Structure formats: C-alpha cells, structure tokens
Regions:
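Catalytic-loop region of hydrolases
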Residues: 48-148, 159-161, 166, 584-585, ...
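A catalytic-pocket lid/entrance helix-loop region that shapes and gates access to the active site
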Residues: 170-175, 271-384
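Glycine-rich nucleophile elbow surrounding the catalytic serine of serine-hydrolase chemistry
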Residues: 256-269
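C-terminal subdomain of alpha/beta-hydrolase-fold enzymes, centered on the catalytic histidine
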Residues: 285, 289-298, 304-319, 376-591
C-alpha cells in the first residue's frame, strides 16, 4: 500500500517556511489592503513600529540630507497563479529607494533600501521572470568593494519575508520566541542590533510565484516550479543584479534557509559553472539530501520506496528530538549543556543504529500520519525502551513519545502540541488556533510577520503595488513542484556542493543548525556533510555551528547575537570558535552514497572516509 500523499502533506508543508496544506497567506500590497491588515490587532505593535521607523527616517534626514528618497507606486498587476505570466511590454526594472541610518553600540551605518523588480533573462537575452527583491546596501568605508549576499527562504513556495523580517536586515520583527508573549500577533518592528549591514550588503530575493515575482511570457510561473528551472532563474537574477549594480568585483555570498539550502548547493554549482565565482555560502537549517529524510522522500514520491534510508532518518533525527525532550525536562540527569548532550546522543544513536532498523519504517510512516501503510507498525518493547533510558538519559515518557504510532509533536507532553519549526514552542491542544495550523511555532510568527510587512512596505521601503497582492507563502507551488534533479526523483545536493568546491576550492561553507529544529534536525545535516569525507584529498573551508533555537534560529534572542558573531568571522574568512570542520564531523552512515554520487543511483554504496 502506498501512503496517501495527503496524509504526508502536513509534513511536507513545513519545510523551511513551507506552506501548510489548504493555507495561502496573502498580504495585500495595495493601500486599502495595507490599511486593513494594519488594523487587524491592537495598536501597540504598529504604533511602536511607526515610531521606530520615523525615528530612523529623521536621523537619516539629519545626517544625510543630500540623499533623496524615491517612493514608487508599481502599476503592474502581478499574479502568482501557476499558469499566469506578464507580457514583455509590462515588465519594468523600477524600484523605490529610501535612505536610513543603522546604529548598534558605537557603530553607525548609513544604508539604502531598494525595493522593486529586476528581470532575469536567459543566455540569449530572452526575459524569463520579473523578480521582486529588497536590497540593503551601504557605501564602502575602506575603498574596497563591499560583500554582497543574496538571501532567500525555501519551501519551495516561500518568499524571502521570513529571513528579511526575522534575521539580519537593519530592522526585524521582535518575537518573544519561544514564547507567545502578550502582544501576539502584533510584534513590533525594531532596529536590529544584530544586522549584518555593517558587514555585507543584503539582497533578499522572491522566486517566481512568490512575493511579487512573476514569469514573463511565453513562460508561466509554473515553468520555474522545479529544482532545476528554479536554480536557473535564480542564477539569472543574480547575474542581472550584479550587472546592473556593477557588483561583479564584489565578494559574492549566498545565504539559504531550509529548501533554500539544497537550492544553494545547486545554485553555487550553477554560478561557478557560469563563471560567477563565489566567496562563500551559508546553509541554515539544511535539508541537503531528500532521500536521507525519509519522511520527505515518502511524501514527495507518494511511495514507500522513499523508505530506503529510513534508519538513517530515525537515527539522524533522534538527537534533535532529544534536545527538545531536554527542554521539557524529559532528560535525567539534566544535560550539562546542549552541546554535551548532542555528543551523548550522537554516540547513542550510532551504537543503536542496527537496532533501529526494525522500527525505522514504522517510525517514518507514523510521522507522516500513515503508520499502517505496510501493515501493523512495529515499535520497541517496553523492555527495550527501558534499556535505552540510561545510555540516552531520556525518560521513558520521552522514549515512548519518540517511538510510537503518532507524531512526536503530540506525543511528548500530554494535552500539548509542540512545534515542528521549533520544538520549544507549544500550545495546549484546546487552543483554537491549532484548528487552522497544527504547528505552534508556525502560528508564533505567521500572522505577526505578515502584519509587519503590511506596514513596512509602504512606510519604510516606500513601495506600494495597488493592483497586486504580495504572497509570502504560495501553497500551490509545493504541490506542483518537480523535485527531480540529477537524474533522480528527489534532490541529493551533496554532489552539487562537491562540484562547486572542486571548481572553486577557496569557497567557504558555513552550516548553521538549531538544536530544537524538528523540521531539519542538526545531526542529519552533520551526516550529510560528512559524505564529503569520502573524497580523497578534499579539504574544504567548511565550518558547522550549533545554536539554541529552532528552524528559524535567528528568532531566539540568545542565538541571534551568537549567529551575528559567527557570521562576522565567516565573512573575515576566520575560524569560528567551537565549529566543527569536515575532519571533526562524525563519519557518514555506511549505507549513504559517496559525495560524488547522487543517493538514488547508489543507495547501497558504502560511504567510507578514505
């Protein structure tokens, strides 16, 4: 029996700002829509945001009076529907330009926001898509070209709103993550002390069918809804931005989150092949090989054939799930640190890997809501679970929460649903908000971010589109996405990363991981990156760091300053304290393909370090 794909849709709908089934969150960019959305809650968040933005604007006017702000009313009626496209006559590369000052401690940076569209075109000059973007740029202080970083979320089907409003732009939405606080859903926009604007220019990109990015005829939006065409159009946008802004001599970086990480691997190889040489890439909350995440493989393929690496999935996920159990005091004795406990759990799952084989398929099918797809599910006996208490330090309750026929999110704590993006975020099962969205960590940010966007676009970015709607999350994309890549049904992008490193041995790679991320658990990422150990003589500039927090690590007020510090070192090409390297990563699972070979074509090939 094949599991019903609909049973897996909740799993698939939350991969790096993926879309929950049956839910499209749309923000009106038109003036009336902005007013309506801004009035959706109490005035605390919006008034605080307005005051903050006015203060920034006043400071800028005083310090840079010669800089002229240019607002822009975009007349184009953009559509994000699958079969829609713009006529070439409608395409215009226009933008709003605003000037502000960012301050953090004793550091002050005058910066410019540019919000609008550029046209991605193929090698023959034929337009492919008119793509919306927001760029934050600052003048060089030492005469050398500033780095420029291209930033995007994942999905597939997400705009760049989540990284742009949550991470390292000069302003951010102040969430009380992992709590909801008292002012949900009206969290304020504030000055972001951890912005990277003092380090790099930032260009946030919306892929076609998201934000206000639309294909240009004869293409349609759906033309680019696949692993390979997505990379092509993203590459062509980046090349256009570099050309229009004379940035080809700048250090060029990529920053992707969730599905944005396989996109980054593929995009890095595509850019390097095209002669655009990168300085570095950041992989945040990564899913680099869909086959090694059997829950995704089964859901996307709609087949139990996706269970081939189910044991790798169970073992790769468990350390992250255990960190969440520790947060809820389900680990005894309490861990000395998150790092120490991660090491303990890595040892535990490696030791018990063979034992997990008996339960792995049942576990994967249970997580996607179809435990009986292959008959009666098989799980460890109480005796076996009890024997695992001491080496894992997990309580029996936590072990039963992990190994059972129901998803972990509702099994760990009775009467409580915990988040998938961030396992520390929880709501009682009686909370009415769970009826429309089953992930508390998604609820935490979705409405607050869209509320903030509704005021930020016209007031701070100076951009309005009275005939269009901005689409943060397009639910129709993931259901239509062609995941095939490199001759396989799903993307395994470790070979792409290897290819980029072989073309550019100086390419720096930084992997950022949240201990409490249940969407892309950190140990799974370690094991995939470790496949690079199979390439004799390869010694990449790879660093892997870990932080408290979930999928969107930067929402955590402790993690975000640490991320900023690590990223500042990364941009200096310096060693990051505590980061793992390729040599110190744990060895890859024995049944994984070598780094040079896509998983599906060599699923039984042992991946052994030289």
């Amino acid at each position: 029996m094949k599991p019903d794909r609909r049973c897996a849709s909740n799993r698939r709908g939350h991969q790096g700002r993926l879309v929950a089934p049956g839910k499209i969150t749309i923000i009106a960019a038109m003036v009336i829509g902005v007013m309506a959305l801004a009035a959706c809650g109490s005035g605390d968040g919006s008034s605080s945001s307005a005051a903050s933005l006015k203060q920034a604007a006043s400071a800028k006017a005083a310090q840079q009076a010669t800089a002229a702000n240019q607002t822009y009313v975009d007349p184009v009626a953009y559509s994000m529907n699958a079969n829609d496209s713009l006529d070439a006559s409608q395409v215009a590369e226009k933008a709003a330009v605003m000037n502000y000052t960012w301050t953090s401690g004793s550091t002050t940076v005058n910066y410019t926001t540019t919000t609008g569209h550029l046209t991605a075109s193929d090698s023959s000059g034929n337009p492919e898509a008119s793509m919306s973007y927001v760029a934050y740029t600052a003048p060089s202080t030492n005469g050398a070209p500033r780095p420029v970083t291209f930033v995007y979320n994942g999905g597939p089907g997400s705009s760049s709103i989540w990284l742009r409003l949550g991470s390292f732009a000069p302003t951010r939405v102040a969430t009380p993550d992992p709590l909801f606080g008292t002012n949900w859903p009206n969290y304020p926009l504030v000055n972001n002390a951890e912005s990277l604007i003092d380090t790099t220019d930032l260009v946030f990109i919306d892929p076609p069918g998201t934000g206000l990015s639309e294909a240009v005829s004869p293409n349609t939006n759906q033309t680019f809804w696949g692993s390979d065409p997505d990379v092509t159009v993203m590459r062509d946008f980046i090349e256009r931005y570099l050309a229009v802004n004379s940035r080809s001599s700048s250090p060029i970086y990529l920053y992707g989150e969730s599905y944005g990480t396989p996109r980054t691997d593929m995009l890095a190889l595509s850019l390097e092949t095209a002669g655009v040489h990168l300085t570095g890439i950041t992989l945040q909350s990564a899913i680099l090989n869909y086959f090694a995440d059997a829950t995704e493989a089964v859901a996307v393929e709609n087949s139990t054939a996706g269970l081939a690496l189910a044991t790798d999935t169970v073992a790769g996920y468990m350390p992250g799930y255990a960190e969440v159990a520790a947060y809820y005091n389900q680990v005894s004795p309490a861990p000395a640190s998150q790092s120490a406990y991660a090491t303990q759990m890595a040892q535990f799952v490696t030791t018990e890997y063979s034992a997990f084989k008996s339960y792995s398929q049942s576990w994967v099918l249970s997580q996607i809501g179809d435990p009986n797809a292959l008959g009666r599910p098989v799980f460890p006996s109480s005796k076996t679970l009890t024997s695992w208490e001491q080496p894992s330090s997990l309580t029996l309750q936590a072990l039963k929460g992990y190994f059972n026929a129901n998803p972990f999110s509702g099994s760990l704590i009775s009467g409580t649903t915990i988040g998938r993006y961030d396992g520390r975020v929880s709501l009682p099962n009686s909370d009415s908000r769970l009826q429309s969205d089953g992930d508390p960590s998604d609820i935490l940010i979705s409405q607050p971010f869209t509320n903030a966007l509704a005021t930020q676009m016209p007031n701070y970015l100076g951009y309005t589109a009275p005939n269009a709607t901005y689409v943060p999350l397009n639910d129709s994309i993931i259901g239509s996405w062609d995941f095939s890549h490199d001759g396989q049904a799903l993307p395994d992008t470790i070979p792409d990363l290897l290819g980029a490193l072989q073309l550019n041995p100086q390419l720096a790679v930084f992997s950022e991981n949240g201990y409490h991320d249940l969407a892309t658990p950190f140990f799974n990422t370690e094991k995939q990156l470790a496949r690079l150990q199979t390439v004799s003589g390869l010694n990449p500039n790879l660093q892997v760091s870990f932080f408290q927090g979930g999928h969107m690590i930067y929402l955590d007020d402790v993690a975000r300053p640490q991320m900023k510090s690590d990223l500042a070192l990364f941009y200096q090409n310096a060693a990051i304290p505590g980061a793992l390297t390729l040599k110190t990563l744990p060895a890859p699972w024995a049944d994984e393909a070598a780094a040079s070979t896509p998983t599906a074509s060599a699923a039984t090939t042992d991946a052994k370090a030289p």
